[in-house]
Amino acid sequence: MVRRILSVFLATALTWGVSACPSALAQSAEAGYRFSPVNQFDVKLMATYWNPIVQYVSAKSGVKLHLKIGRTSTDTTAYVLTQEVEFIFSNHLFSPEREKLGWKVFGRRNSPAIRGEIVVPADSPITELSQLKGQEVAFPGPEAFIAYKVPYAQLLNAGIDVQVVFGGNQNGALAQLFAGKVKAVGGNSQLIEGYANRERRQFRVLWRSEPYYDLALMVSGRVPEKDAQAVAQAFLGMHKDPAGMAILRQADQSVGITDPIAFVPATNADYEAYRRFYQTAPQQLR
């Protein structure tokens, strides 16, 4: 099976206000902590979405957060695995091995459940998954749970061998689709809908997974409880503050989300569907 990485992103990781050096111990609130959301969009759009939110949370909590984003979702997840960050927005840590790292869920967005999808342009001659056999199919990256692992598992289980192409994030994968370089895309239903709204594109959904909760806000066990609670309360209270709600609406609009979204409390128990996936997933995706 051919795998190739599309070089469509910046060659170096982008970090706002932080050093790239790993930290073995939790920093003080005065020094600040690193916050890494998974790359759901290109780097520029990620910054547009998250910078105002991070600035609000820092000011409201009194705990300085610095946005740290890699050029791809794989790079950003690597920051987590090497303990370079203390707060994350991710769904990449629910495999049995990664749960041992001790990250704690404290929130999520109250968006509708997300699903893995395999899509083609609305005018594509492809109408069934079986027609993808031997074709190139783009995914955001090997770490993307909803957009890669879930739909690719479906293809593997159905015996449909495709050539995997990684686009670095959802936007990159979809750009390859409309450039005619791949026949289909595996994706996150929320991100595909947002892309369709922003770019005025239409899709045909060939397959859709069971529902999963949106990505989780998580904190490392290395962060003192006082700081963890202050940051959590700032995130979870944003929608109750007119200034915070305005920032959330602006962020939603920047990525094509039409319904108002807020951060709400969540726990590790809310992500049981992710754990079930790993119990039966093809070995190469565990």
Give each language-model segment a name.
Residues 1-4:
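Positively charged n-region of N-terminal signal peptides that target proteins for export
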Residues 7-20:
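Bacterial N-terminal signal peptides
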Residues 26-93:
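Extracytoplasmic small-molecule ligand-binding "clamshell" domains
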Residues 30-37, 41-52, 219-286:
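An extracytoplasmic/periplasmic, membrane-proximal ligand-sensing/linker region
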Residues 74-87, 100-101, 130, 171-186, ...:
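Short helices/loops that flank or line small-molecule/ion binding pockets
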Residues 124, 135-233:
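Pocket-lining segment of extracytoplasmic ligand-binding domains
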